[in-house]
């Protein structure tokens, strides 16, 4: 690749990562398609994806830094988003939401890695879309937990169980956790916020492990490309999260489910 070409590829993939990482549409599915179309595949591409995921994670930290500090008992006034004030969401909620996926992820790590292929991703996109529709249809008319601080430990644990579905590549971690939250009585907005908060420790742990294993593929020559991808993913993820939290107050997740089916069809068209 030429230098300019590699930077353009980095920017495009950073945009894709930032837009899709925290939406219930599967960033994995999008990265597979776009990476294939751009001819950017292989070990360097996998390492690049790990690095730009860190940019997306940083966006969540910036967006929810007050709430994250609050989880460890450090408060800076009231966080500027809904469902805040009672201070009932705790680190225990986050830990309960993490445990199921962490345990299964460690036990079945090698098997999960073997599932990373376009066909499995395609099926996961479809099943995840169906789950979003089921969640919208079966969710309680009046949520038991309208805000984050209304969530119970039991609800947090069940959301964590649903997060295990995201170990299937292409399912979408946010899609699984948000759907699970709605089905156990958490409002669409609060379930989305909890999904974002849960992403920080989950993704940081997984990304740190992948980055450690990929160190051999990092070179100084790739640094500009990785930096462009990281910064692009961070900025785009900030905008995507803000926009997403704004629009879900007004629309259901049905459009996201339909979009997942379209992406699944695209994966089928490109790789079958």
Swiss-Prot record:
It catalyses: di-trans,octa-cis-undecaprenyl diphosphate + H2O = di-trans,octa-cis-undecaprenyl phosphate + phosphate + H(+). GO terms for cellular component: plasma membrane. The chain crosses the membrane at residues 6-26, 45-65, 89-109, 115-135, 156-176, 189-209, 221-241, 251-271. One of its GO terms (molecular function) is undecaprenyl-diphosphatase activity. Keywords: Antibiotic resistance, Cell inner membrane, Cell membrane, Cell shape, Cell wall biogenesis/degradation, Hydrolase, Membrane, Peptidoglycan synthesis, Transmembrane, Transmembrane helix. Belongs to the UppP family. This is Undecaprenyl-diphosphatase. It comes from Cronobacter sakazakii (strain ATCC BAA-894) (Enterobacter sakazakii). The lineage of its organism: Bacteria, Pseudomonadati, Pseudomonadota, Gammaproteobacteria, Enterobacterales.
